[in-house]
Amino acid sequence: MKQMTRFSQMACLALFVLFPLTVSAQTITLTLSDQNSEMSWGPVHATQPWVKQVEKATNGKVKIQIYPSETLAKGKQNWMAAKDGICDMSWNVMSYYPGLTPYADVVVLPGLPFRTGEKGSEVIWKLFEKFPEVSDQFAENKVLVLYTSEPFILMTSKKQVKTLEDLRGLKIRTVGGPPIEQMKALGGQPMLLPMPDVYVAMEKGTVDGLEAAYEPIPGFRLNEVVKYITEGPFAPSLFAVVMNKKKWNSLPKDIQNAIMSVSGLEGSKFFGRNFFDAARVPIKKMIEEGKYDIKIYTLPETERARWVEVGCKPIWEQWVKSMEGKGHKKAREILNAALEMGK
């Protein structure tokens, strides 16, 4: 009897030891809400490869299930979807949430020194790490990646814009924050629209054009409604991949470290480089080969200088004064840091 009792005790002890190993070895599946089509450039060249990097870094212990094309949450709802646990992770256009992260808007000021998404992404992540005032405004969710597009281009359907005078009065889809003020200063009428709604708005003439990067042109079939592109001193846009805090805190520390090993600064630069910078080459090639019926015009330096004086530098000062007026006393210091980091 004693032998049986000892055997039972040993068996129970073995189960007690082995059971946690079995549980920890189970795959953790995380959901990621995305507004973009799974076939569009950014997801194919950045989001999906990053997901694979996470899976590799965690030795397969983490799997991420992407829900594309707003199938889990609408684009404008993605921040709250992550916060409320509707999804574990979400891809966010930060301009959809005016006033949520005002310090971070510094990187969407027009005319900053950086000219690529990769450099802009480096700037915003370093600001996020350096200034608690920046990171605290993202505190509702766990931030995995912060990245920017390259400075926007202006796309129009019926009128080619070559001068400030050409832009005046045009209804232009833009994003929230400083780009709205720039468009007003340049004489355009800013319109806030989610990217999935732009095609129909352009087709119906609800808007005359839009500010965006090159990347969404094929994914949102903008080549069918855009006839002209103007390259000038426009602002970029800011994006974030975030995670529900409770879910993040539930992950083992080694899993957290593995995820951040492919996120953070290097992950942000990866997204900026692959989501946006790399997209320009094939799209411009399609235009050059006549596969897209679009004309590209780059502002000459003299005209560009006019735009900078009218629609860039005054916006910087306006942003600082507005921020300081709302109690955000670090605005000028953060702007100066962004200008220095962006060189």
Residues of each region from the PLM?
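Bacterial N-terminal signal peptides that target proteins for export
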Residues: 1-12
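Intrinsic disorder/low-complexity segments
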Residues: 4-5, 21, 154
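Bacterial N-terminal signal peptides
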Residues: 10-22
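N-terminal secretory/targeting leader peptides
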Residues: 26-121, 133-343
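Intrinsically disordered, low-complexity, polar/charged regulatory segments
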Residues: 128-129
